Design a protein with these regions (language model features):
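Conserved catalytic core of the tyrosine transesterase superfamily
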Residues: 1-287
Length: 287
């Protein structure tokens, strides 16, 4: 089996499992790099030792972030299991331990400051969708005109995480910011298949996540509360925290975030965890 034939089979297997386009792209990248490293004529001759050599090479010679390295591990392990039918153990495809604590998440008040101070209509619209609707960065850059329903004020998100379709609501304020940006860009409701955030380099394509992330990071550096580990994804933390501060129930926040688990949603909520001086008397009705 040639490398190209095996990649085609790999993508068919990923499609059958309804994995997202982002996962497809990442897995394709890492398996392709694995082939460049091993240069196999027949991929069926590849072994787990080859995979381990490749992953060791990544660890020893490249300074990839832990999460990026773990994506590479997942990609190679999935390829071996789905295409070569070789099942390695967790010890053979060892992933790095990643801290799940964001040290300096963007607070709701900071997110509002970012929105109010932003002079770039494109970035302001993206921030409004990230903080005001809780949308992921990849959901924002792939948003099309047809996905925005002005009458009922909701957005349809196709190919969301897990290759699912979900809907999110948006406020009048978010609508005004988005409409202002579209007016400046000349984006109209007639161009239904057009991207809201088009690529500046490739006609007909959408802006990449890296471009939006880079623009946001540069903007953050002009703000007084900037810290290096703050990212565009922090706006989702601010979205969840802001809803929790307004007493929106956790299951509702979970649905709006598009999470399968309430535990995942709870991780996004950053509220003071101070214990009360006295335990409330739960045996007496509140007046």
């Amino acid at each position: 089996m040639t490398p190209n034939e095996s990649l085609d089979r790999f993508h068919r297997q990923l499609n059958a499992r309804h994995l997202s386009n982002t996962t497809h792209s990442n897995y394709h990248l890492w398996v392709s790099r694995f082939f460049e490293y091993c240069r196999p004529d027949d991929v069926s001759e590849l072994t787990i030792d080859d995979a381990q050599d490749f992953l060791l090479n990544l660890s020893e010679n490249y300074d990839y972030a832990d999460r990026t390295y773990n994506v590479a591990v997942d990609a190679i392990r999935s390829f071996f299991e789905l295409v070569l039918h070789i099942h390695g153990s967790g010890k053979e495809f060892l992933k790095r331990k990643v801290s799940v604590v964001q040290k300096n998440p963007i607070t709701p008040d900071q997110a509002l400051t970012l929105l109010e101070s932003c002079q770039d209509p494109m970035l302001k619209a993206a921030i409004a969708l990230g903080f005001g609707c809780g949308m992921r960065i990849e959901e924002i850059v792939t948003l099309k005109v047809v996905n925005i329903h002005k009458g009922s004020r909701f957005i349809t998100i196709e190919n969301s995480k897990g290759n699912k379709t979900r809907t999110v609501k948006y406020s009048l304020s978010a609508m005004e910011i988005l409409q202002n940006y579209c007016r400046i860009r000349g984006i109209t409701s007639a161009s239904k298949d057009s991207y809201i955030f088009p690529s500046e380099k490739k006609s007909g394509d959408h802006m990449s996540c890296s471009v939006l992330s880079y623009t946001f990071r540069n903007y953050l550096q002009t703000i007084s509360f900037y810290l290096p580990d703050q990212t565009f994804h922090g706006l989702r933390h601010a979205f969840a925290t802001s809803l929790a501060n307004r007493n929106v129930p956790l299951p509702v926040i979970q649905k709006l975030m598009g999470h399968q688990s309430a535990a995942t949603t709870a991780f996004y909520i950053h509220t003071p965890q101070e214990e009360p001086d006295e335990l409330p008397d739960l045996l007496v009705r509140e007046k």
